[in-house]
């Protein structure tokens, strides 16, 4: 027994030595400082995952503004100087921004690659998104969202006894329920043959979405979904409802989904379930960050009396100018694109809420060896290495945003009450100062719609409801760090609030 243990011990020791000699990457001349970590393959992943912000700050103090970390077998160059962000974007010809995102999508949602280079489809999906989420298409999408929000918030035929009563609910649960149902109907339409059971079906989809989304960080990290039986079953149920045979019988399906259905049928070799899973990816992208962003915007607005007053006055003025009535009854409220865009206070509230809660990781993959020229110097980058920006470092930098952990509803307003677009770091004007939606070629194509639907939600909450926290001195809930890198962080726990319809 002792001999066997000794042999195993020697084998492990030899393996570790071989890994140390062969497996550890060595820093070459001109490359950024390197952190390999102590654990094979994982490298620094556990430290990074436990608290990305503090991990990056610690390495920034140790190495300066540019350094390399091994994460899950990949070498990631972190650029932490906000003055260099725009310089990274200028090197676009050396980056493959699609590779990481397409691989992640296939891994999480269970379809084959949507990269045209892999031969499964010839669709340029980024062009599809741009065509159907911006410009004229945004008008019809926003109009549908406003109608669906009002249908969900103010269901027709509500008994007067219920409309007069205060309702107590978790604010995050409320935002989740309202935004999911309205967003689902806006993108995928409604089944007119199942009007009576429509709400129950969507709420069932909501439960499945929560189950799937709960394990999403693990899927992105590389764990197979088969390890999570409940989430796997939930994903398959969601996809089943998004098969083309089911979407074809729905009314008011968005232009985005109708175009994607056509392109999937004509340009891809995907089977029916894979096509449905590409639609599931759109559902996730439309909900996973918008829901927590909506919560933080509402929470921070109600928590700040100054923000509440300024927003209420702005919304009231906009509705009156548009000839709309500020009440819960009567005709539906509607503001067009020009009117929605002319709400600087709501814009600033949303931006400030997202600044405090966003923790996205902007990633690009090097297509070849090249030299990256930044404000801090030039660095040699190897092919297949990743370049990463972590904008939370900038969003919480006191040099750029004084008192960065405090919500200031007018932080993005200038002295004249218009949108503020000038921010500085070390006396230098920043070209990039607000990045919750990504940057450059990887910027979220649906960002304009996301902001508009949050704005519409806030308009309806202010115009239709009386709003109060259950606790008068409510504290800000901590952020759920388990989703760091994916976008907007949800609250670690919910906050109780109460609401009732205005009369």
From Swiss-Prot:
Induction: Up-regulated by dietary cholesterol and cholestyramine. Down-regulated by dietary bile acids, such as chenodeoxycholic acid and cholic acid. It is found in: Endoplasmic reticulum membrane; Microsome membrane. One of its GO terms (cellular component) is intracellular membrane-bounded organelle. Its main location: endoplasmic reticulum. Its cofactor is heme. Signal peptide: none annotated. The keyword Repeat does not apply. PANTHER family: CYTOCHROME P450 7A1 (PTHR24304:SF1), CYTOCHROME P450 FAMILY 7 (PTHR24304). This is Cytochrome P450 7A1. The gene is Cyp7a1.
């Amino acid at each position: 027994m002792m001999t066997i243990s000794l042999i195993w011990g020697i084998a492990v020791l030899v393996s570790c030595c071989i890994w140390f000699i062969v497996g550890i990457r060595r820093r070459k001349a001109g490359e950024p400082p390197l952190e390999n970590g102590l654990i094979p393959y994982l490298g620094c992943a556990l430290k990074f995952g436990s608290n990305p912000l503090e991990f990056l700050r610690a390495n920034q103090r140790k190495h300066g503004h540019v350094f390399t970390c091994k994460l899950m077998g990949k070498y990631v160059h972190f650029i932490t100087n906000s003055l260099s962000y725009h310089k990274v974007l200028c090197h676009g010809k050396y980056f493959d921004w699609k590779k990481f995102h397409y691989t992640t999508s296939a891994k999480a949602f269970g379809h084959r690659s949507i990269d045209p280079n892999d031969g499964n489809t010839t669709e340029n999906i980024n062009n599809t998104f741009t065509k159907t989420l911006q410009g004229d298409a945004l008008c019809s999408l926003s109009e549908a969202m406003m109608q669906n929000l009002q249908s969900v918030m103010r269901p027709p035929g509500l008994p007067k006894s219920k409309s007069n009563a205060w309702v107590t609910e978790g604010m995050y649960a409320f935002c989740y329920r309202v935004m999911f149902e309205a967003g689902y109907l806006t993108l995928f339409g409604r089944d007119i043959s199942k009007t009576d059971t429509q709400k129950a079906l969507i709420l069932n989809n909501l439960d499945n979405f929560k189950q799937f989304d709960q394990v999403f960080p693990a899927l992105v990290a590389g764990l197979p979904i088969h390890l999570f039986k409940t989430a796997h079953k939930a994903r398959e149920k969601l996809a089943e409802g998004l098969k083309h045979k089911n979407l074809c019988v729905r009314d008011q399906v968005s232009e985005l989904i109708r175009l994607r259905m056509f392109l999937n049928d004509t340009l891809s070799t995907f089977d029916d379930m894979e096509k449905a899973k590409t639609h599931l990816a759109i559902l996730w992208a439309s909900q996973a960050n918008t829901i927590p962003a909506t919560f933080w915007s509402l929470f921070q607005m109600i928590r700040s009396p100054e923000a509440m007053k300024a927003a209420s006055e702005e919304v009231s003025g906009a509705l009156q100018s548009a000839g709309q009535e500020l009440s819960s009854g009567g005709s539906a409220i509607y503001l067009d694109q020009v009117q929605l865009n002319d709400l600087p206070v709501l814009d600033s509230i949303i931006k400030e809420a997202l600044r405090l809660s966003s923790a996205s990781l902007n990633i690009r993959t090097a297509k070849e060896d090249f030299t990256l020229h930044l404000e801090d110097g030039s660095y040699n980058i190897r092919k297949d290495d990743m370049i990463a920006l972590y904008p939370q470092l900038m969003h919480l930098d006191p040099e750029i945003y004084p008192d960065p952990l405090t919500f200031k509803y007018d932080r993005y307003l200038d002295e004249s009450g218009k949108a503020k677009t000038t921010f500085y770091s070390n006396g230098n004007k920043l070209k990039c100062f607000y990045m919750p939606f990504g940057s450059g070629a990887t910027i979220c194509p649906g960002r304009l719609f996301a902001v508009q639907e949050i704005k519409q939600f806030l308009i309806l909450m202010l115009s239709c409801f009386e709003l109060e926290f259950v606790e008068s001195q409510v504290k800000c809930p901590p952020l759920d760090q388990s989703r760091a890198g994916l976008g907007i962080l949800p609250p670690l726990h919910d906050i109780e609030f109460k609401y009732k319809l205005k009369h």
